[in-house]
Amino acid sequence: MPTINQLIRKERKKQVKKSKSPALVKCPQRRGVCTRVYTTTPKKPNSALRKVAKVRLTSGFEVISYIGGEGHNLQEHSIVLVRGGRIKDLPGVKYHIVRGALDASGVTGRTVARSKYGTKKPK
């Protein structure tokens, strides 16, 4: 605990909050172009082939983003919308691709949580 004199001499440092998604540059989403679409394996206790894409954003950053849902139509040069949100078992993946926006199609045959996967209401 500092004394009053110590506080007069040197004031307290302000705590700076570090962004969890710096590549979005204070925007809710960013548009980008897929440069590589591939699968990768998760960290130790889990086992799968997770679908990810390397995306060059309009902000100039190149990020790895996760493609959620079953099946996708993305390939190189696809235009996608990227939002924040990390994948806990994939190191370095801090972004999600928004399904149902731009070139990323919605998940077909989805009946629950449709809004998260860009699926229209079934007739």
Curated annotation (Swiss-Prot):
One example of a Gene Ontology biological process annotation: translation
Keyword Cell membrane: no
GO cellular component: small ribosomal subunit
Alphabetical list of Pfam families matching this protein: Ribosom_S12_S23
InterPro entries (alphabetical): NA-bd_OB-fold (IPR012340), Ribosomal_uS12 (IPR006032), Ribosomal_uS12_bac (IPR005679)
Listed Basic residues bias regions: 10-20
UniProt-recorded Gene Ontology molecular function terms: rRNA binding; structural constituent of ribosome; tRNA binding
Span list, region Disordered: 1-24
Modified residues (3-methylthioaspartic acid): 89
Signal peptide: none
Entry keyword set: Methylation, Ribonucleoprotein, Ribosomal protein, RNA-binding, rRNA-binding, tRNA-binding
UniProt superkingdom: Bacteria
CDD domains referenced in this protein's UniProt entry, alphabetically: Ribosomal_S12
Subunit description: Part of the 30S ribosomal subunit. Contacts proteins S8 and S17. May interact with IF1 in the 30S initiation complex.
Cited function: With S4 and S5 plays an important role in translational accuracy.
Family stated for the protein in its record: Belongs to the universal ribosomal protein uS12 family.
Name of the protein described by the UniProt record: Small ribosomal subunit protein uS12
Gene (name only): rpsL
